[in-house]
From Swiss-Prot:
Organism whose genome encodes this protein: Salmonella agona (strain SL483)
Assigned protein family: Belongs to the SELO family.
Cofactors (names): Mg(2+); Mn(2+)
Top-level taxon in the UniProt lineage: Bacteria
Task performed by this protein: Nucleotidyltransferase involved in the post-translational modification of proteins. It can catalyze the addition of adenosine monophosphate (AMP) or uridine monophosphate (UMP) to a protein, resulting in modifications known as AMPylation and UMPylation.
Matching InterPro entries: adnlytase_SelO, SelO
EC number: 2.7.7.-, 2.7.7.108
Top-level class of the enzyme under EC nomenclature: transferase
Positions bound to Mg(2+): 249, 258
Binding site residues for ATP: 86, 88-89, 109, 121-122, 172, 179, 258
Substrates-to-products reaction catalysed: L-seryl-[protein] + ATP = 3-O-(5'-adenylyl)-L-seryl-[protein] + diphosphate; L-threonyl-[protein] + ATP = 3-O-(5'-adenylyl)-L-threonyl-[protein] + diphosphate; L-tyrosyl-[protein] + ATP = O-(5'-adenylyl)-L-tyrosyl-[protein] + diphosphate; L-histidyl-[protein] + UTP = N(tele)-(5'-uridylyl)-L-histidyl-[protein] + diphosphate
GO molecular function: AMPylase activity; ATP binding; magnesium ion binding
Keywords attached to this entry: ATP-binding, Magnesium, Manganese, Metal-binding, Nucleotide-binding, Nucleotidyltransferase, Transferase
Protein name according to UniProt: Protein nucleotidyltransferase YdiU
């Protein structure tokens, strides 16, 4: 089967990009590719043949129909207007046309200098490409909207960051790379007609059902807000901290995008800061819902030339509704509740308080809770708490709440185990794979990818364990 590519972004939004070719790396070689995703997309196996060099995965060749561009956008970074940004090291190679008529962006990260590189070198490093590949695939298999990773190429090109690292490229796939920052760019350039063109493009290609509706723009922004709310709810329930929620890292389609200084909670710490550059804690775990709303308000401002203020405010209210509704549903599922009762939030908050006091492991606590039996006053979870009396008091109330529902243990446990993962991408697991890969051993990278494809399967190895001493509080930054 021949892959078919289109260039809708390039053809329809000429003011939003610069056309250019990738700059290949020295002695580039394919070290990992997503065989499952490649099969789904009918990508010929021959494209991954190492005897052909790095090929399209390393920017050495293009596939028929590809028309590479680097996109321009702007944004607020850490709450401050940063002006023009753009694809400083990434190039949108083309949009794959799928059988159902939809498209999928092929975006090559680390593809070399662009007009938007600013003071950067246009490169990505092996460390960051491995982290993004693992994180995006982990999120996908957790059921959270995200970009996807298709391939990683390593090289002999040295790249200077805090230390000298190895240059690499990541092929990232997404339904769209349209960001809040695209709209901000033209709004602050006082080109409202181009802001409206972006909205028209989004509606035409992703919400065509509203194309001929008079209030299409208000309906569209309402859905953007709702998708963002549901996404943030998913992050909070699984314990994911993005680390750098700048407006240019926010997806119009409600996808998790731009994995940098992210982290999944180990110990439950609502004030967890994943990014060691975030000195004020703006993007700490428990502030993500507020930041997402702030970012939506910045997007709403760009839409004021063609959406009434009342409609924008209604959409922002929709964000709050979607966030709280989805979060409530997810947390009830994590606790094994099939109905909503007035004391559920209090019960959840009591558990969170206990976990925060004791430094309980977020993922393991909920996974162990999913094995609870209504009639048993004992729980393996009890042994993880120092204050047994406090846990016992909470657990008695929890079991009493379970008994208010006519659901047997087997069904409830099954539901809980579908939403409480046994495995998440802890930073130490990613670091172990990175350390091996930097020594030329890709086995752990491949093994970890396989493990992350089955996050809801119980394991008795260290992929499901708490981090070792060296793996606690690993510092990560925006440098990639």
């Amino acid at each position: 089967m021949t892959l078919s590519f289109t260039a809708r972004w390039r053809d329809e939004l000429p003011a939003t990009y610069t056309a250019l070719l990738p700059t290949p790396l020295k002695n580039a070689r394919l070290i990992w590719y997503n065989d499952e995703l490649a099969q789904q997309l009918a990508i010929p196996a021959s494209l991954f043949d190492a005897t052909n060099g790095a090929g399209v995965w390393g920017g050495e060749t293009l596939l028929p129909g590809m028309s590479p561009v680097a996109q321009v956008y702007s944004g607020h970074q850490f709450g401050v207007w940063a002006g023009q940004l753009g694809d400083g090291r990434g190039i949108l190679l083309g949009e794959q046309l799928l059988a159902d008529g939809s498209t999928l962006d092929w975006h090559l990260k680390g593809a070399g200098l662009t007009p938007y590189s600013r003071m950067g070198d246009g490169r990505a490093v092996l460390r960051s490409t491995i982290r993004e590949s693992l994180a995006s695939e982990a999120m996908h298999y957790l059921g959270i909207p995200t970009t996807r990773a298709l391939s990683i190429v390593a090289s002999d090109t040295p790249v200077q960051r805090e230390t000298q690292e190895t240059g690499a490229m990541l092929m990232r796939l997404a339904q769209s790379h349209m960001r809040f920052g695209h709209f901000e760019h033209f709004y602050y350039r006082r080109e409202p007609e181009k802001v409206q063109q972006l909205a028209d493009f989004a509606i035409h290609h992703y919400w065509p059902q509203w194309q001929d509706v008079p209030e299409k723009y208000a309906l569209w922004f309402e859905e953007v807000a709702a998708r963002t709310g549901r996404l943030i709810a998913e992050w909070q329930t699984v314990g994911f901290s993005h680390g750098v929620m700048n407006t240019d890292n926010m997806s119009i389609l409600g996808l998790t995008i731009d994995y940098g200084p992210f982290g999944f909670l180990d110990d439950y710490d609502p004030g967890f800061i994943g990014n060691h550059s975030d000195h004020q804690g703006r993007y700490r775990f428990d502030n993500q819902p507020s930041v997402a709303l702030w970012n939506l308000q910045r997007l709403a401002q760009t839409l004021t030339p063609f959406i009434e203020i009342d409609a924008l405010n209604r959409a922002l209210d929709r964000y709050q509704d979607a966030l709280l509704t989805h979060y409530g549903q997810r947390m009830r599922q994590k606790l094994g509740f099939f109905t909503e009762q007035k004391d559920d939030n209090a019960l959840l908050n009591e558990l969170f308080s206990l976990m925060a006091r004791e430094g309980s492991d977020y993922t393991r606590t909920f996974r162990m809770l999913s094995h609870t039996e209504q009639q048993s006053a004992s729980s393996p979870l009890r042994d993880t708490f120092i204050d047994r009396a406090a846990f016992d008091a909470w657990f008695d109330r929890y079991r009493a709440r379970l008994r208010t529902e006519a659901v047997d243990d087997a069904l409830r446990q099954q539901q809980m185990q579908r939403v409480n993962p046994a495995v998440v991408l802890r930073n130490w697991l990613a670091q172990r794979a990175i350390d091996a890969a930097e020594q030329g051993d890709m086995a752990e990278l491949h093994r970890l990818h396989e493990v992350l494809r089955q996050p809801f399967t119980d394991r008795d190895d260290d992929y499901a364990s708490r981090p070792p001493e060296w793996g606690k509080r690993l510092e990560v930054s925006c440098s990639s």
